[in-house]
Amino acid sequence: MGRAPCCEKVGIKRGRWTAEEDQILSNYIQSNGEGSWRSLPKNAGLKRCGKSCRLRWINYLRSDLKRGNITPEEEELVVKLHSTLGNRWSLIAGHLPGRTDNEIKNYWNSHLSRKLHNFIRKPSISQDVSAVIMTNASSAPPPPQAKRRLGRTSRSAMKPKIHRTKTRKTKKTSAPPEPNADVAGADKEALMVESSGAEAELGRPCDYYGDDCNKNLMSINGDNGVLTFDDDIIDLLLDESDPGHLYTNTTCGGDGELHNIRDSEGARGFSDTWNQGNLDCLLQSCPSVESFLNYDHQVNDASTDEFIDWDCVWQEGSDNNLWHEKENPDSMVSWLLDGDDEATIGNSNCENFGEPLDHDDESALVAWLLS
């Protein structure tokens, strides 16, 4: 494909032209004209390429060529034409008679482009140059427009370009809520009330280290008419005259005497007034064991046995403490089996309740349990 070569490359002479070749080319063109540059070398008898013959004739052998250096007037005209026409050297050479396009191009690249900033414009010549440019521009044919390739247009060319400014969204920082002093104070008071109520419900255990039972003044539920730690619940069972009534507000003196105050509402029964808190008070307070056993013989009630504080009975006797007698395990078992011997069981004050046992007592108890 492509353009056909101007001549056959076989046997073509290359290099500088000789004077004989210049003379043959000049004589042939003067007699026959330029004609076709492809057939000219063959017709003239030259072993040269047609392009080489054309360039040799146009640039060197023509009779109308202007020899010598380019004048300042020509330089100014070249500058003006170049500013309007650009690098169209053939059009610029058409406005300069006797100058070729190749000569003007070489002179521009080697001289004018370097000293363009030092070039001085003369008013007399500028008027002539402007007139020449206007006449030549009107007579010159319009330049051919570049052909545009047919095809689909891109989406970027079809869509209108709209520049949108992006607005930054500012995050709203919520300030931390101020603490409400009233609410905090109310919550604190509520917690204090709850804690005090819990402590009131738990209560204090009886003091087993010599203090009198009258010192325990805290009630279980904090209500009037309900059994408290001061109440001697065992006295409810020790009343021989009327065992069916209940006695509240019963206190025990320091010498073991019982002072009972009859309650008018005491005949209601154990199921109505007895609760778990009163049972704990019964087990914690240590009444007279002898009086309790006497009442047990008089009143055979099945519910009485569950209120006996057997820990107090085990730990203390009438005169001698069973845990400190250092007897054999058989004697301890015999004492436990002889429950009718009331003489061996005396009044107890629970002074040693909760105290750790001696090493001998612990070993004796373990031996009895393992036997």
From Swiss-Prot:
Highest taxon of source: Eukaryota
Regions that span the bilayer: none
Induction: By nitrogen deficiency, sucrose and UV LIGHT. Triggered by HY5 in response to light and UV-B.
Kinase keyword on record: no
One GO CC term, this protein: nucleus
UniProt organism field: Arabidopsis thaliana
Tissue: Expressed in stems and flower buds. Expressed in seedlings, roots, cotyledons and apical meristems.
Function noted in UniProt: Flavonol-specific transcription activator involved in the regulation of several genes of flavonoid biosynthesis. Activates the expression of CHS, CHI, F3H and FLS1. Controls flavonol biosynthesis mainly in the root. Confers tolerance to UV-B.
Protein name (database record): Transcription factor MYB12
Cellular localisation: Nucleus
Region feature (Disordered): 136-183
Applications reported: Promotes flavonoid biosynthesis when expressed in tobacco (Nicotiana tabacum) and tomato (Solanum lycopersicum) through up-regulation of the biosynthetic genes. Tobacco plants exhibit increased insect (Spodoptera litura and Helicoverpa armigera) resistance due to enhanced accumulation of rutin.
Basic residues: compositionally biased ranges: 146-172
Pfam name, any one: Myb_DNA-binding
Consequence of gene disruption: Reduced flavonols levels in roots. The double mutant myb12 myb111 and triple mutant myb11 myb12 myb111 accumulate less flavonols in roots, leaves, stems, inflorescence, and siliques. The double mutant myb11 myb12 is specifically altered in flavonols content of siliques and roots. The triple mutant myb11 myb12 myb111 is impaired in flavonols biosynthesis and exhibits a reduced UV-B tolerance.
Disulfide bonds: none
Family matches, as PROSITE patterns: HTH_MYB
UniProt DNA-binding residue ranges: 37-61, 89-112
Chief location: nucleus
Keyword entries, A-Z: Activator, DNA-binding, Flavonoid biosynthesis, Nucleus, Repeat, Transcription, Transcription regulation
SUPFAM superfamilies xrefs: Homeodomain-like
Keyword Transcription in record: yes
GO molecular function, one term: DNA-binding transcription factor activity
GO terms, biological process: flavonoid biosynthetic process; flavonol biosynthetic process; positive regulation of DNA-templated transcription; positive regulation of flavonol biosynthetic process; response to auxin; response to ethylene; response to light stimulus; response to salt stress
Domain HTH myb-type, first and last residues per copy: 9-61, 62-116
